[in-house]
């Protein structure tokens, strides 16, 4: 038997691709003529940068370049120098079900790099990094509705259900000329650390306005002859408006922003003898917009007239969403393996990982922070110390949530003090932006098969008196005896269908052959 039903559904994100591939980086580097010979290598770093991402014809194509940065001590002045070389990479992934408006998420993670010196001016390096790729699309999940005809008894559960109304992504560039101001002139850049943070979002119909800030930290050479170094910490605010179909003032927005690639060059300034920094970043902003509404989900159903067989499914419901921002202080002591430290030149972090777990207390974010210390030993020779520090942080006000859509950690600041001539005490401030969600799995009815050829046999008596057992409810009694739930509630003055009625006598009348539910 088929009935007319109201089609109800909610929308969620679904990953049509979620994979990772290893990319190799092989570099044969010869120093330019203006660079002095290498006496000691301090640090080799892989910096993957993604330039383009395209999805066409069932293939996701990702192209970019990997910068290999070498920090070393020169053989003449025993000062810190830097050289780098870039190699291109390309990777394609097969996407079986390519969506019409996909959202592409990518990230890279350096794995290792090995360096071998063939001469004081030539290095051969072999490294690898992981390229993570995910493609998101939207998918509808149907919610079963009982037929309009009054022939089924349905057990309903009222829930909060978040439905995806917008899923959009936009790439954009931020170009800025940065002046060092009253700081020493920049002659050569040694290392760069860039992070991005979304500070505020506002939605109007069809548009999302995002405000954020870019934090640029530089270590550079101020005088090539003396080898003196300087540091720059620059905060650049930005704003961007992107088109988002389905977004409005009532949408709960989960927004993330990633740095795909960046380029920093020195540029002569006609107004000053100090060169400017030309900063060119390519950012990618991703938005998931949700609207939370009340829904009545059918968790069980039966007919008072015919035999029935309900089919069940698991509904994955998001009942609440929130953007959580928090900070964490991680303290650690780093000891030098050999020798002593006379001076700390710079402390930075070039990598931070994050994962999350959930329990009754809330969402805990944990991972590792890579700490890089550039210092001088007792002989005034530069040394490099690298450590991975574990951290774990319970997000504030997260006890109501059991899932995270996005976890974005960043190292906001690092301070230190020399505890003694071989130990550095570090204080690292980590800031988190977490898009938290409360997820539920509900066993719900997906369809009900009604067997008209198997009618319910009428009871021979006019009244049944039933003594409820422990754990029974009016619903379970009504279903097992094929009687109308509303009538059972009315006759027994029960407050609700799930009220505990253990050891209570329950009575109900039966339909005669010529009666209908409306006659009772």
Describe each model-derived feature in a short phrase.
Residues 1-470, 475-493:
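C-terminal beta-sandwich interaction modules and adjacent acidic
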Residues 494-505:
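Short acidic, glycine/serine/threonine-rich helix-capping segments at coil-helix boundaries
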Residues 509-516:
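Conserved small/polar residues in nucleotide/adenosyl-binding loops
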């Amino acid at each position: 038997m088929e009935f007319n039903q109201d089609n109800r559904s909610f929308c969620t994100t679904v990953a049509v691709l979620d994979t990772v591939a290893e990319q190799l980086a092989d570099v044969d580097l010869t120093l330019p003529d203006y660079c002095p010979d290498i006496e000691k290598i301090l640090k080799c770093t892989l910096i993957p940068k993604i330039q383009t991402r395209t999805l066409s014809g069932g293939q996701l194509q990702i192209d970019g370049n990997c910068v290999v940065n070498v920090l070393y001590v020169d053989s003449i002045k025993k000062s810190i120098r830097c050289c780098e070389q870039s190699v291109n990479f390309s990777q394609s992934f097969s996407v079986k079900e390519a969506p019409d408006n996909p959202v592409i998420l990518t990230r890279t993670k350096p794995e290792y790099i090995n360096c071998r010196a063939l001469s004081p001016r030539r290095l051969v390096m072999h490294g690898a990094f992981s390229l993570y790729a995910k493609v998101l699309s939207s998918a509808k999940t149907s919610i079963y509705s009982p037929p309009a005809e009054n022939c089924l008894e349905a057990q309903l559960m009222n829930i909060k259900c978040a439905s995806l109304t917008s899923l959009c992504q936009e790439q954009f560039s931020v170009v800025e000329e940065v002046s060092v101001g009253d700081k020493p002139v920049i002659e050569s850049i040694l290392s760069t650390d860039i992070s991005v943070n979304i500070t505020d979002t506002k939605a109007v119909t069809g548009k999302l306005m995002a405000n954020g800030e870019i934090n640029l930290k530089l270590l550079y050479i101020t005088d090539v002859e003396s080898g003196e170094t300087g540091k720059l910490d620059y905060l650049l605010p930005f704003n961007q408006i992107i088109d988002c179909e389905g977004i409005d003032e009532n949408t709960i927005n989960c927004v993330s922003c990633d740095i795909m690639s960046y380029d920093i060059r020195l540029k002569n300034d006609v107004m000053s003898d100090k060169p400017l920094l030309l900063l060119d970043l390519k950012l990618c902003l991703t938005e998931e917009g949700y609207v939370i509404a009340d829904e009545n989900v059918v968790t069980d159903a039966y007919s008072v007239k015919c035999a029935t067989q309900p089919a069940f499914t698991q509904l994955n419901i998001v009942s609440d969403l929130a953007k959580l921002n928090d900070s964490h202080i991680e303290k650690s002591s780093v000891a030098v393996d050999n020798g002593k430290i006379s001076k700390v030149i710079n402390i930075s972090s070039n990598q931070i990982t994050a994962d999350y777990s959930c329990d009754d207390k809330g969402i805990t974010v944990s991972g590792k922070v890579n700490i890089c210390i550039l210092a001088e030993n007792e002989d005034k020779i530069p040394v490099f110390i690298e450590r991975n520090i574990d951290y774990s942080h319970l997000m504030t006000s997260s006890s109501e949530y059991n899932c995270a859509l996005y976890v974005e950690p960043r190292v906001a600041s690092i301070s230190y003090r020399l505890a003694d001539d071989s130990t550095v005490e570090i204080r690292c401030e980590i800031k988190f932006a977490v898009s938290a969600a409360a997820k539920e799995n509900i066993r719900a009815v997906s369809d009900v098969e009604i067997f008209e050829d198997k009618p319910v046999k009428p009871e021979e008596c006019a009244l049944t008196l039933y003594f409820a057992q422990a754990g029974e409810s009016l619903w379970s009694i009504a279903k097992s005896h094929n009687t109308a739930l509303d009538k059972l509630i009315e006759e027994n003055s029960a407050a609700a269908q799930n009220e505990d009625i253990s050891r209570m006598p329950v009575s109900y009348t039966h339909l005669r052959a010529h009666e209908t539910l409306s006659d009772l």
